[in-house]
Amino acid sequence: MLTYIYQFLGFTALGIATTHHPKCKAIPGTNSWPSQAEWSHLNTSLSGRLLQPSPPGAVCHPTQATFDPLSCVAVAAGWLTTQWHTDNPVSTIENNWNNDTCLPVPTLPCSGKGYPVYVVNATCAEDVKKGVDFARENHVRLVVKGTGHDYLGRSVAPKSLSIWTHYMRGLEFYDGFKPKGCRKSIDGAAITAAADTQMLELDEQAHLKNLTIVSGGAGTVGVGGYLTGGGQGALSSTYGLGADQVLEMEIVTPGGDILTINECQNRDLFWAMRGGGGSTFGVITSVTIRAYPSTELHVASFLLGTGPGTEEYWDVMADILSQYPALDEQGLSGYAYIAHNVVSAEMNITSAADGFAGAFFLPAFHSSNTSLSLETVLKTLFADATAAYPGKFMSTVTVKTFPDFWAWYKDNNGPLDAGHNEVLGSRLIDGATLTGNRTALKQGYRAATPPGGLTSVFLVGGKGTRNAKPRGGGNSVNPAWRKAYIHSVIGASWNPLDSAEEAKQKALLTDVYVEGLRKMAPDSGAYMNEASLPSHALKYIRLKLTIVQAYPDEPDFQHAFWGENYERLLAIKKKVDPQDVLWCHPCVGNEGWELVDGVLCKK
């Protein structure tokens, strides 16, 4: 959740226009920006679905034309929910992606400087094409927003045209699927989902058909962003990543072509779009994925805890984490957290403590996969890890069986918090790191866990991601996923408009917490959908007319996110989008552009 470097000055003060700098994207207030007649023509072609939204928090500000105290009450309440931001054409789940430019707080400043100028409210592929064509022909910066649930801020930009796919919804189910242009059908269940189908809806509708899909833990994630970034979840240890499930996509290319891509046609794009990141190679209008027969799911909720600040705790954590590959071999997966000096009602930690808590899953594929076997595995794991420290640790393991993944998800996951300022950092941890140097493992996670905070140790890799067989023989998912067992995520947050605290938290995240994981697993990579942004600076400067934000540093993000696949991805990007109609940060091929005083220009 960090933003591009935005420097907001009055347009007349910028002195930058494409008439003088033809290598820059067009901006409002200059001769290069399309005329009102041109925007009106686009609106007519879209049957009136070209929006010019006010900043979403403007109803709370007396200086804004849309000021409405009654509406402000509703907006302020909705601001804290993910669905409210999803339903708004320009808002995002984290404030910092809009540079805190218009929060629903009357005492804070409000402007539209952090938001797109116009929005195409797309309902079909033709609408998307019209938006892409207009941006390309008029050299306007283009962004794509589905749900706004994007931890890299790719779904919003100032001085831009946005394509909003929110109303592109719909599902179609198949008992077998024949990709367009292919001679043979693919056996097994499949689902075609329109561009902005949310994963919560997809999970639920699959459940109603007695099917299960690979999905993550956040229901407001859109299917397009989830799959193009890789897509991890509790069942990826069984079936592979979300990108591994894709059978076909329909996309609009930067050149304005509406294409069906699969293993039989447009194969380079099919490879690139499954893991190469969103808003880069094209705009998804629909996607077809595999689905699997539902099966019972045994779920163990657990807590292992001790007093805060003990050396023994880190020894035990290193021992448990070293057993993750063995847990994967026994069919387990799930979500767990290392908690350091934490009080957490959600984790049942009622006083400051160090703990290890979460939920592990065991699908009932075999008669030996029972609730008792899952309970035994975890109780044995905790007993063995703490045997050297009698009386210093307490543990609980509670196992429950659910009819399928959806039943567990519905009972255990509510809406995520929203309307805050936050960034993430992450690392994929491979088996050699886990089973090798125990001291390095201990020191790495100790360095990566904030005091009073959490570090995730999600068991979402292993056999499923290693042995996945994506259609066409491969995809562009980070090769580090094929060796990884753990996806570790750390977050940092701060209050809006608190530049000093923001700089501090970003520096800690980059230079201390994520760096601890990088040193421990230097040859691995990161999951791009939940990762830090690259930058060469960690300064945060706020002047009266200028906002400059810099981001946590993911060194060499190209290879941290895509490994050896990056060079091929870059070649495909240059071929499919020679004009860089789609540009985002950090995305494939973005090296040729930079933000100059808030304007996107070629280097």
Outline where the language-model segments fall.
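N-terminal signal peptide c-region/cleavage motif recognized by signal peptidases
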Residues: 12-14
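Soluble FAD-dependent oxygen oxidases
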Residues: 2, 16-603
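Classical eukaryotic N-terminal signal peptides for Sec-dependent ER targeting/secretion
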Residues: 1-10
